[in-house]
Design a protein with these regions (language model features):
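An N-terminal boundary/leader segment
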Residues: 1-68, 91, 330, 337-340, ...
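Serine-dependent amide/ester hydrolase catalytic core
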Residues: 13-16, 263-274, 297-301, 309-316, ...
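Short, well-ordered beta-strand elements within core beta-sheets of diverse protein domains
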Residues: 13-20, 101-104, 219-226
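Acyltransferase
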Residues: 22, 29-30, 273-280, 318-346, ...
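Immediate post-signal peptide segment of exported/extracytoplasmic ligand-binding proteins
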Residues: 26, 63-80, 230, 277-292
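Short glycine/serine-rich loop/turn segments
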Residues: 42, 76-221, 249-255, 292-294, ...
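Charged, often glycine-rich, active-site loop that binds/positions anionic groups
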Residues: 96, 141-143, 352-380
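A short helix-breaking turn/cap at a secondary-structure junction
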Residues: 197-323
Length: 451
């Protein structure tokens, strides 16, 4: 057993230990598995990793053999990571947190998994999420992940934070990094609640082929790391051109030209990350940072609108705790000390989406898109994309959406509500997305009727 400590170890630390012989890839995987057993499956039972890669130790042994022969596949060879339950990882189930897909087996890898496997990184397992990523901290097939910092707080935003398992696993050092996925803010919310770095890419920068979709116009891969240096390591591997566009709506649609990833990425992300505090200060000097008033209790007009957003009432006033505002002020002072400007700003993109104040429109009333389009984008397109995902995967047991009991996509959520109620936990908030489920089920049923 190696004495190397993986807690809070960065990718560079892990690679250095591997290169020096202080630890082997097998010992790294074993160390992470011990942490998972101690804190995820027992003790505080954080419940972040829900599907394990039984080949992880064998893959680590392969990495060690490559290292002994100086035949490494890349800078992440031997580095363990996790991925959300919405990623296809060949041979593992890919339930996306839904009872209906509990036994769906991935016949191939998602693009990001494929890239990491090709580079020698080792998948520890898949992380928790609500059913089909529809929500945030609602419990799905595997329940939900809990906060590694404070049992009284959520590890992601309740309404939109479906990559909660990835956030917990990465923050708790159950792997070097995690792969989340995002439609609204499902990648950023767990990062915010767990002091992590998250990268939400522009369309087409990271291929989403092989990821379960929710709303294909918005779905993106979102890596989670503990530092920006680690983020650069991951992006150097997964930001790459993908010739196969199936399952990636923006790259497959013919109307808007999306540049190839190789045309928009730097030669090396690692080379653009400052290596010390002095270099970081130079990067920040002269930059202008905006702090939205609505998030620090400084916008009296926020939250007074009477409009409705896509799924119901939105645009409520955000009441931020003083302890959080204090942290805003500390961060602002640090930026100013580095030579940056920090200014209070309005956030019209939010106001115009949520109708959060008198006179502001919502996405439904602004006139840029019709209510019919919103229905088709969020419901009909979701049903179509689920069917296409299943067909592209090719599991003979679940070859398409037509053979799926549509109600189990949603009623699994109801089953979890029954379990929660039996524990004496209030279920009112758990059922927050019930109307969404009803609408999605209707779209699935309509799709099945046309097949």
């Amino acid at each position: 057993m190696s004495s190397f400590e993986v807690t809070e170890a960065g990718i560079g630390d892990l690679r250095g230990a591997l290169e020096s012989g202080r630890v082997t890839a097998v010992q790294l995987v074993e160390a992470y598995l011990r942490r998972i057993e101690a804190y995820d499956r027992s003790g505080p039972t954080l419940n972040s990793i829900v599907v394990f890669n039984d080949d992880a130790l064998a893959e680590a042994a392969d990495s060690d053999r490559r290292r002994s022969r100086a035949e490494l596949l890349g800078p992440l060879d031997g580095i363990p990571y996790t991925a959300k339950d919405s990623y296809l990882a060949k041979g593992l189930t890919a339930a996306a947190g839904s009872y209906a897909f509990a036994n769906l087996v991935a016949q191939k890898d998602a693009f990001a998994i494929e890239r990491l496997r090709r580079g020698g990184a080792i998948l520890i397992g898949l992380t928790n999420m609500p059913a089909m990523a529809n929500g945030g901290m609602q419990r799905g097939l595997y329940g939900r992940a809990e906060s590694p910092y404070n049992e009284k707080f959520l590890t992601a935003a309740f309404g939109s934070g479906s990559s909660n398992g990835s956030g917990t696993a990465t923050a708790a050092s159950f792997a070097a990094f995690g792969l989340g996925e995002e439609t609204w803010s499902s990648g950023r919310a767990p990062a915010t609640n767990n002091a992590l770095c998250a990268y939400t890419p522009s369309r087409g920068v990271i291929s989403v082929r092989g990821n379960w979709p929710l709303v294909p116009t918005m779905d993106v891969v979102v890596p989670h790391t503990r530092t920006m240096a680690d983020m650069a390591e991951v992006l150097d591997v997964i930001v790459a051109d993908d010739a196969d566009t199936r399952g990636d709506l923006w790259r497959s649609q013919p109307w808007i030209t999306i540049p190839a990833a190789s045309k928009v990425r730097p030669g090396s992300y690692r080379e653009i990350i400052p290596t010390d505090t002095a270099a970081a200060r130079k990067v920040l000097a002269g930059k202008r940072f905006g702090v939205p008033r609505m998030y620090i209790n400084a916008d009296p007009e926020a939250g007074v609108g009477e409009g409705l957003g896509i799924g119901g009432a939105t645009g409520q006033r955000i009441e931020t705790r003083q302890s959080v505002i204090d942290l805003f002020q500390v961060a602002g002072a640090a930026l100013i000390a580095a030579g940056a400007d920090v200014v209070l700003v309005d956030f019209p993109v939010v106001s115009n989406y949520e109708c959060d104040r008198a006179g502001a429109p919502s996405i439904k009333t602004r006139g840029l898109v019709s209510p019919e389009f919103l229905h088709r984008e969020i419901l009909d397109l979701s049903a179509w994309s689920w069917d296409d995902f299943l067909r592209a995967n090719g599991d003979p047991a679940i070859p398409n959406l037509a053979v799926v009991d549509g109600e189990r996509i949603a009623t699994g959520h109801l089953a979890s509500l029954a379990r929660i109620a039996a524990l004496g936990i209030p279920t009112s908030r758990e059922n927050q997305h019930a109307d969404d489920w009803d609408a999605l089920l209707a779209a699935v049923t309509a799709w099945q009727a046309r097949r």
